[in-house]
Every structure is written in C-alpha cells, then in structure tokens.
C-alpha cells in the first residue's frame, strides 16, 4: 500500500508565527511592523490570561523566539537566505515528484496523436522526400507471391550465415583461460584511439609527411540535412579516422597458442611481504579514528566546508547557527503535548502550520 508523504519544512516560517509574510521585509517600516505583530500575538496568547495552561506557555515561547530572530536585521537577513534555500529545495523535490507521478500514470496508456502532431509529421515527411527526390505517387504494394519469395530468400541466407559465421571454440572443452584471453585482448586492441571527435575543418586530401592520422567525414544523425543546398555544412560535421568501424581479424586456436599467456594475470593475487603489516596498521588507525569520533561532542565537529559546501556557493555565512540558541531542546516534546489541548482555547484556523512535525523546528543544522 502506497503512503502519501506530506511536505516537511526543515526551516520554520517565523513570519507566519507572527501573522506576517516575508514581504514585510520590503517595507521601509519593517522593524515597526514586526514589533507590532509581536505585541498583538504576545498580548493574545500571554500565559497570564490562561493560568495553568502549559500549551499557551509553549505558544508564547514560540512567538517570542520568532520575534527574537526577526527583530535583528542581521539575523533576519540570514534567516531569509535560509528560508529561500529551503523553499527552493522543496519546490524542486515536488516538481520531480509530480513528473514521476505523471510518468507512472502514463505507462500503459496509448494516447492518440493530436491533429497538430499529425500535420507536423506529414510536413516533415514531405520535406525529407523532397530532399531525396522521392515521389510518393509511385508507391505500389508488393505482390503476395513476391513477398513470399523475398522472405524465403532471407530465411535461406540467414541459415547459411548461422553455419558460415559460427565462431570457433577457442578453448578446449570450454575451459576459459583468463591469462590467454587477456593476452589476446591486449594484442588486438592495442592501437591508436579511433573514437569519434568533432572536427571544424575540411579533411586534407593529401597524406601528411608525419605520422598524423587521416580523417574521413561521415553523416552525423543529429544534423542530417543542411537548409542551404549550396554549401556543405562543414562546421557541424563529425569525423572519424579511416579505420573507424573496421572489424578485428578472426582469431584461431593457432593464434592463441602462438600468443601465450599474459604475465600479469598469475601475479595479481600474490600478497607482498608487507601486506599483513600494512593491514594491521590501517586497522589500528581506523580504531583510533573511531575512538576519536565516539568521544566527540556537539561543539567538536567542524563546520568549515573549505568553500565547497552548497551554502558557500550561495554566499551565505552559517558559521553560527542562531536558531540553535533560540530553540530550547525540550520544545519538540512540549509542542507535541500542547497539540491535543490547542483546540480548546485557540480557534481551529490559528496556527495550522503547527500540525506539521515539530522535529523540523528544533533542527538548527544547515546540512545533514
């Protein structure tokens, strides 16, 4: 049974806690609006108005925490950067998830092409036929007797190929020899690289005095036709050397016997004299590192990514995670408890975002 997961926000929306949006930062009196919003919320949910209600105390602490971060311009700018990164990451994830769901739903469905697609296909076929000088009016159906003769001829040709092109068993009794195989492979594949490469010039018709490689152009399937029939599209052609695509010579049992075995095959599993000594040394180093990590505490871990972190590329400085200082460690458990009591005092429309998992509100780390 599939489970539908809801979006999880690792960064709490402090503006929403105060009944605002991040658009308030664009206003000239941003600080004053944040202060007034905090005053309204603090007055409405002050613990003195609800004596004995622990859930109200927790909500008041949450409102105060949001104001402590947003009232300072530096902390507010850092928080805005974090919020932008979080929303962008969530947006990318949801887009990918939607694309996957659409693809999964479309599997097995046969959609008829639209009229525009049919028209576009016909126009493209007409253009290709025109370039090749192909006249579709001359098309005629192949008679049934000729089709049967052609099919019979192809079947006979395929049967003869199965006999003539059957590979010889190079290893006696089917026993594969890795050393012999590697020696033959190295010999027949040890040559100059003949991979395809882009070429922006015209190949020379003359042999070079040096040992340079000659090239011959061939069609690039990504650029079959040129719109201008008066020129050759040299700038976008692909070239390969003249040996490109040539088949390797056929190997016989006698060739294998003459080549022998590769020397490096038999010795690759031989352990050196210092093998076990080096192994013990590495195990000892690993144990020391493990002990060191086990003794490390929260503040001992390095936060410096040497400029290679994701947030470093965004120009954000998160060397000091201010939310860690603002969120008490017990807030997660306390907020979970107050959810059951919330509807008794607070209208259902208030703080609906609090129904999301609160583990994201107590996590002040930048990355995981």
Curated annotation (Swiss-Prot):
Keywords: Chaperone. Residues 13-83 form the J domain. SMART domains: DnaJ (SM00271). CDD domains: DnaJ. Pfam families: DnaJ. This is Putative J domain-containing protein R445.
